[in-house]
Amino acid sequence: MANIAVICDREFFQPFDQRVYKEVLTLKRAGHEVEIITPHNSNLIKEIEGISVHCVTTKGPPVSTAYRLIKKAIAKDYDVYYCHELDPLLYSFILKWMKNKPIIWDCHEYLVPMKKELQGNLSAMFTDIGIKIAAPRVDHIITVDNLLGRQLAKLNKVTVVPNYPTVNDFPVLEKTLESKKPNFLYVGG
């Protein structure tokens, strides 16, 4: 089976990234060796359910965190690089050039509109350019919904994998409460 590096663009532990965790457990159950590489407040290796989590410090200028993530990713001979979100997508240029291994990009956000709303037009424009240049160069894209999947399919091959909470995320009530009030359901990761 494959030896997979999952590269995160934000802290995996605080807050705990349930989406990445579910994906990693699924890959592990399928027989793959999986390790997570993530920004963190210090350099260390943690283990969670037999999965190594390589933490690299975020101290220093932002570019130094990217450098450390890439350095950690190329230090081992992984079979596949699984990049979460925008920054690791951009790192994939270097990973592909240095290691020539398959790159999977997991995009679960509408990045351009989000950047526009949170950081303005210039950030949205650079994000759009970065995606249009980098996404066609990865080996595959995974996303969470059909609309985003159709948008990204213009750039590369896409697989849509919906991200719903597991049944274990909800407590089981011993008895059912009867109520005339409506029930609301939340579907999300």
Language model regions located:
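A short beta-strand-loop structural module common to alpha/beta enzyme folds
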Residues: 34-41
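Membrane-proximal helix-turn-helix segments that form the acceptor-binding/catalytic region
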Residues: 25, 29, 67-74, 90, ...
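Short, solvent-exposed amphipathic helices
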Residues: 84-90
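A short, glycine/small-residue-rich beta-strand->loop->alpha-helix junction that serves as a flexible
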Residues: 6-22, 83
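Conserved donor-binding/catalytic core segment of Leloir-type glycosyltransferases
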Residues: 4-5, 142, 176-189
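Carbohydrate-associated surface elements
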Residues: 147, 164
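Conserved donor-binding loops in enzymes that form glycosidic bonds
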Residues: 9-10, 163, 186-189
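A short, charged, and often flexible helix/loop element on the N-terminal side
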Residues: 49-73, 118-123
